[in-house]
């Protein structure tokens, strides 16, 4: 399973090539405002040969999405998946992000994958009906062997947002900020 944000490459005949678990890690910082660490992966086979992958992950206090910066060699396209559970939820794609909302007992969970428009390359659903193999994927273009994307979730009982509309507005605002970052010029 790609869980929420795991990478894979679709090959011929709907065969997926996926990275395995990380083989090494390095904690860069673990402060009160930001946690930052790096994950190294063993080389893995893609549809056209060997893939090299390293991720730098940051999670800022108060944010609902973690930022994942990937250094990747061996492909110019890749996808990040969200595992589809037994009961099909609602998939929504908007500009440069994808959400999957599903009921969970008496609550709702919403997973999200987001990227910049320059990396965005659509989305697709892979649903062979096999447990842990059903996913919705956000597709990416790799630029200069790098990719930046964001992964997170919302749980309706967290009381962090007043409802799904507020969560959706948070995502739309965040997508706009990611696409138009603040720049500071010092003279």
Predicted regions: what they are:
Residues 1-61:
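Extended, loop-rich substrate-binding clefts of extracytoplasmic carbohydrate-active enzymes
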Residues 26-33, 61-63, 71-77, 106-107, ...:
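A short, structured loop/turn motif at beta-sheet edges
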Residues 35-39, 53-55, 66-68, 80, ...:
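Hydrophobic residues positioned within well-ordered beta-strands of beta-sheet architectures
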Residues 41-45, 59-63, 72-74, 84-86, ...:
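Beta-strand elements of well-folded, non-transmembrane domains
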Residues 43-50, 105-111, 121-125, 157-161:
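Short, surface-exposed beta-strand/loop "edge" segments at domain boundaries and coil↔beta transitions
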Residues 51-53, 64-95:
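Acidic (Asp/Glu-rich), glycine- and aromatic
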Residues 79-132:
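Polysaccharide-binding surfaces and accessory modules of carbohydrate-active proteins
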Residues 115-187:
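Beta-strand-rich recognition/accessory modules
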């Amino acid at each position: 399973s790609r869980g929420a944000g795991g990478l894979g490459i679709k090959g011929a005949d709907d065969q997926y090539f996926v990275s395995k678990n990380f083989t090494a890690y390095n904690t860069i910082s673990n402060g009160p405002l930001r946690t930052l660490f790096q994950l190294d992966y063993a080389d893995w086979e893609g549809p056209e040969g060997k893939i090299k992958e390293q991720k730098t992950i940051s999670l800022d206090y108060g944010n609902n999405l973690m930022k994942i910066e990937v250094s990747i060699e061996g492909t110019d396209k890749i996808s990040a998946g969200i595992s589809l559970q037994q009961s099909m939820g609602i998939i929504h794609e908007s500009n440069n992000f994808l959400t999957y909302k599903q009921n969970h007992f008496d609550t709702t969970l919403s997973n999200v994958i987001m990227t910049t428009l320059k990396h965005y390359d659509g989305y697709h659903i892979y649903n062979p009906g096999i447990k842990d193999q059903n996913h919705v994927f956000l597709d990416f273009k790799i630029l200069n062997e790098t990719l930046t994307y964001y992964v997170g979730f919302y749980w309706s009982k967290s009381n962090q947002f007043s409802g799904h509309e507020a969560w959706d507005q948070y995502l739309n605002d965040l997508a706009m900020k990611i696409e138009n970052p603040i720049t500071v010029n010092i003279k």
